[in-house]
């Protein structure tokens, strides 16, 4: 899914959507006042997702692993629910094949 324009900008709107969703969740997590035991795990995995979105190089297993770790760390925090849902939806969109299915 590595689609790039000149200047390094990612051309695929799904990848841009992932980057925007991850940025929103990172911002909301940064200002969330509660002490979260797995905050560092969530922050690390959000950084991984952000890096993949910036590069446009999306590894499906890694995307899903990071999403699971973030959801496990933050899933019980209702204030972050909408932003987390946006990240999940963006990961799902990035995982959808637009071309012919492989291996089947």
Which positions does each model-derived feature cover?
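Short amphipathic alpha-helical segments that predominantly mediate membrane engagement
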Residues: 1-75, 92-104
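Mature extracytoplasmic or organellar-lumen-exposed domains after removal of signal/transit peptides
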Residues: 77-80, 84-90
């Amino acid at each position: 899914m590595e689609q790039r324009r000149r200047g390094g900008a990612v051309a695929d709107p799904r990848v841009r959507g992932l980057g925007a969703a991850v940025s929103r969740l990172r911002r909301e997590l940064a200002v969330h006042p509660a002490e979260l035991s797995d905050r560092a795990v969530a922050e690390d995995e959000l950084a991984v997702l952000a890096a993949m979105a910036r590069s446009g190089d999306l590894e499906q297993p890694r995307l899903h692993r990071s999403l699971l770790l973030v959801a496990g760390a933050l899933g019980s925090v209702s204030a972050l629910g909408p932003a987390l849902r946006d990240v999940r939806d963006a990961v799902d969109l990035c995982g959808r094949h637009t071309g012919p299915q492989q291996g089947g």
